[in-house]
Each structure stands twice: as structure tokens, then as C-alpha cells.
Amino acid sequence: MVTHPDFFGGTWSTSPDPVDFRAFTGPDLTVDLPNNFYHDAAGKPYPLVRMGGKELMSLEQYARQERVLGYYGGQMASFEAVFSPKGQDGQPMPLFDRDTGRIDPFVEKAWQKYNISNVLRTNWKTLGPKLRGKLHLFCGTADTFHLDEPLRLLETEMKKLGSDAKIEFLEGRTHFDLYNGGLTERIAKEMYAVARPKVRGAR
């Protein structure tokens, strides 16, 4: 949507993966100093998985679990497949060392072009008019993977820019029950109204 605003009629994104890299499921990927993917400067582990108000798994535990299961198919590897430059071996370069959590500053810098919040902020003069009425995002306030946190940062940026983006937080909903209560039907109706505006009942 952000890359091709003239082509798409809108986006209705639910529980979007980190849209602001200042909170990439924990670490801030926008800082210049050497950073760690597993813990903050004080050594406190970044939590990742929560359910019922309880933190169940840290980011380090999650990454190590994926490593045991295999390189391909995991969430962290999928981020690298999309965002990372290609290494000498032809594979996506890892953002962080799986043993220590140390972030590779070269890869971190390469990821910045996918930081949606920053892309919007720095290109708003051009993108703003093209995205008017097109941005709709939904997330639970208790998202299982803390995805509400980067979305709140994006919401703040959108307000500063005067955007009409509709960012909605569903109280108490997690990553897995977000659609309860008719959200699917609501999104479908809104999409249909854009795609088929002349059809009766579309709005």
C-alpha cells in the first residue's frame, strides 16, 4: 500500500507485523549504537509471547526455539527473508547473532527502508494525499506478540502528520481472537464499498 499507493484502493491490516522499528517486538532497530536483539541495555530480556496477562516466552527463547526447529519457516527467518540483503552464500543475512543476540549494524541499516512509520514520515508530502482514506489498521490491546506497541507509535506519527488513517485497538483482544464480534464482516463490507461503490448495499 505504501509502496504502490496509486495502485491499491486501501489496506485493512489486522495485527500487522511491526510497523515502527522503534519497537520491533522489543528492540529499537533505529538506534546507531551496537544493539542487542534479546535484551535492553540493562540486560532485561525482551518479552515476546503473552497470554492472559502473563508473559510466557522471551524474544531470546522464541528465537532459540526456531533455531532448533530449523532455519526455514520461522518468524525471525521470514523477516530476514524479506528485509535483509543477500549474503555471500546467497542466503538472507541474519539481523542478529542467534547465540548472543548482537545485532549486525549493516543489516539493521538495510532494514530501515522497510520501516513503514519512517517511510511515511519522511515521504508524507508525496504519500499523504495518495493515502487519504486508504489506511485502516486493527490490533488487540492484548496482542499475543505485543504488536500493539509499534502500532501505537505509528498512530502517534499519523496524528502528528494530520493523517486520516483509521487505527483501532480492540480492547482485550489477542492475536488469535481479534476477529470475534464481527470484524471480518465489517472489513469485508468496507472493502466492498471501495471496490464496488455503485453496488447497492456496498455502503
Task: Indicate residue ranges for each PLM-predicted region.
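Non-catalytic cap/lid and distal C-terminal segments of serine-dependent acyl enzymes
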Residues: 1-203
